[in-house]
């Protein structure tokens, strides 16, 4: 039997890659259709009007407008208020 363990002495020295989660556009900022509003794990913030949800729970704008955050029934919601511009 060996008196000492072989090679690799340290079990540490690993780290995962950063995921860059969080709010990307804050309230009052303008969003284009398709722009990412929030990157998250799980639905910490729920989609409101004109906001879609990706398979990784990313929230994105479905229409151009101004981003608004509100709380309703104990849930945080993010919506995009569409601006009606006269053409």
From Swiss-Prot:
Molecular function (Gene Ontology), one example: structural constituent of ribosome
Gene Ontology biological-process entries: translation
InterPro entries reported for this sequence: Ribosomal_bL27 (IPR001684), Ribosomal_bL27_CS (IPR018261)
Keywords attached to this entry: Ribonucleoprotein, Ribosomal protein
Entry superkingdom: Bacteria
One cellular component term from this protein's GO annotations in UniProt: cytosolic large ribosomal subunit
Region annotation Disordered: where it falls in the sequence: 1-20
Record-stated family: Belongs to the bacterial ribosomal protein bL27 family.
The protein, known as: Large ribosomal subunit protein bL27
Species whose genome carries this gene: Treponema pallidum (strain Nichols)
């Amino acid at each position: 039997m060996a008196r000492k363990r072989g090679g690799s002495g340290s079990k540490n020295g690993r780290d995962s890659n950063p995921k860059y989660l969080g709010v990307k556009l804050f309230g009052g900022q303008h969003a284009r259709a398709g722009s990412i509003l929030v990157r998250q794990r799980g639905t910490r913030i729920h989609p409101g009007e004109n906001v879609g949800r990706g398979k990784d729970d990313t929230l994105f704008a479905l229409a151009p407008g101004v981003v608004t955050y509100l709380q309703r029934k104990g849930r945080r919601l993010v919506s995009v208020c569409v601006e009606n511009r006269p053409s």
